């Protein structure tokens, strides 16, 4: 008898939660119009560049040019330590920048405050039909997102900036389940 009441209560709670989420949760019916079946960030970036016939590219956080070297259009890479062709932080780059970009890839300092600033600054220099791609948006475990960094393989809390950006009125955001999560931001 106790089990039956407990099971009945569980079913009622499940039903109430289902109704609540149908009424109050986000309705998401946007389409990104990408037919993307590859696994890596550089595959997605090159696919987007080719599909949209983009001419220029900005990469924030180049770390040994792992992605940067695979991009075959006019490009600027920003990194304070290694890779790219602008030695300095993204903040320093944006202070002196006067160019707009078709495609911007953010894979720099994986901390919410900096990623948020990188998104805001990137939006200022994004061409009308351009796209921003962010890496490391879906950490596989709590240790992968812990700030400060405690492990070599690390996503940081990039995901928080992407979640916040979803509330901004003038952009659309998407997350691709690929390569530790790829966030995509476009102007509406």
Language-model regions, residue ranges each:
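A short alpha-helical cap/connector motif
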Residues: 1-105, 109-188
């Amino acid at each position: 008898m106790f089990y039956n009441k407990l099971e009945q209560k569980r079913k009622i709670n499940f039903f109430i939660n289902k109704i609540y989420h149908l009424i109050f949760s986000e309705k998401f019916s946007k389409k990104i119009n990408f037919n993307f079946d590859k696994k890596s960030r550089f595959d997605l970036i090159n696919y987007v560049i080719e599909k949209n016939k983009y001419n220029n590219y900005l990469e924030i956080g180049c770390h040994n040019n792992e992605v940067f070297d695979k991009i075959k259009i006019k490009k600027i890479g920003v990194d304070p330590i290694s890779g790219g062709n602008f030695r300095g932080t993204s903040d320093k780059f944006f202070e002196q920048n006067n160019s707009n970009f078709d495609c911007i890839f953010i894979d720099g300092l994986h901390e919410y405050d900096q990623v948020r600033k990188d998104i805001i600054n990137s939006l200022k220099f994004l061409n009308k039909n351009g796209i921003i791609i962010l890496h490391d948006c879906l950490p596989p475990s709590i240790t992968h997102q812990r700030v400060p960094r405690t492990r070599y393989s690390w996503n940081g809390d990039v995901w928080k900036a992407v979640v916040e950006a979803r509330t901004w009125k003038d952009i659309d955001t998407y997350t691709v389940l690929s390569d530790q999560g790829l966030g995509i931001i476009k102007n509406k």
